Design a protein with these regions (language model features):
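TRNA-recognition modules of translation machinery and tRNA-sensing kinases, especially anticodon-binding
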Residues: 1-205
C-alpha cells in the first residue's frame, strides 16, 4: 500500500459486508441487492495507446448486482444473473459475446466467472463491460456470513455472487459507436422514453 486511503473498487465490497457476522434464516434466501456507485482503480503501470481513454479509468460509475444464496442454489442464481446482464445488452441492442474464463484468468476468490464484452467500433475490438462470478463460500467464510437451516437448525456458510450490470462509461461509448447513421446517432429504443428523442444530431439545441 502506498498510503492509508481506501476507495471501493466496486459496490460489491460494501454491499456484501452488510452481512458480515450474520446468521441468516434459510427462508430469507436468496438475498438480492443492487447498488449504483462510483468505483475507483489505481491502474498502476497502465499507459500507452491500448489503455488510454475509456479502456482504463481511475474512476467510473457502475451498477452492481449481489446475491447471497444457499450452496445448492448458487449456480442457479449465477445463471439468473447471467440472463439479467445479457437481457440488458439485448435491450440496448449492442453487439456482445460471453466468455467463460479459464482457471488461469479467473480471480483466486471466484469458483466460476463469466465476462461480457461489447464491440467497440472505434477501436475494432471487444471491451469488457461486465463480469459475473460465483465465489461459493470463499467470501462468506471470511465474512462469517452463514444461514440456519429451517428443519434441523444446522448452521452453514452461504454462497455469494456478484456481477456488473453494467460498467457505464464503456456502455455509453459502445452505444455512440455502434449507432452511427448519416443523420446522426440513433438512440436505442429502450432509452428513448428516458432521453425524449430518437436521434442525436447537430440540429439539437
Amino acid at each position: 500500500n502506498l498510503d492509508d486511503l481506501y476507495l471501493i473498487p466496486t459496490a460489491e465490497v460494501p454491499v456484501t459486508n452488510i452481512f458480515r457476522d450474520e446468521i441468516l434464516n434459510e427462508q430469507d434466501l436468496p438475498i438480492k441487492r443492487c447498488a449504483y456507485s462510483a468505483c475507483f482503480r489505481r491502474e498502476a503501470g497502465s499507459y500507452g495507446k491500448d489503455v488510454r481513454g475509456l479502456n482504463r479509468l481511475h474512476q467510473f460509475d457502475k451498477v452492481e448486482i449481489v446475491r447471497i444464496d444457499k450452496p445448492e442454489h448458487s449456480y442457479q442464481s449465477l445463471d439468473e444473473m447471467l440472463d439479467h446482464v445479457e437481457g440488458l445488452l439485448k435491450k440496448l441492442e449492442l453487439p456482445y459475446h460471453i466468455l467463460r474464463l479459464c482457471g488461469g484468468d479467473i480471480s483466486f476468490t471466484a469458483a466460476l466467472c463469466y465476462d461480457f464484452e461489447v464491440w467497440s467500433a472505434a477501436q475494432e475490438r471487444w471491451l469488457e463491460v461486465s463480469s459475473v462470478s460465483n465465489f461459493e463460500s470463499y467470501q462468506a467464510n471470511r465474512l462469517h456470513c452463514r444461514y440456519r437451516h429451517a428443519d434441523d437448525k444446522k448452521i452453514e456458510l452461504c454462497h455469494t455472487l456478484n456481477g456488473s450490470a453494467l460498467a457505464l462509461p464503456r456502455i455509453v461509448a459502445a452505444i455512440i459507436e455502434n449507432n452511427q447513421t448519416p443523420e446522426g446517432i440513433r438512440v436505442p429504443k429502450v432509452l428513448v422514453p428516458y432521453c425524449g428523442f430518437e436521434m442525436l444530431d447537430d440540429k439539437m439545441d
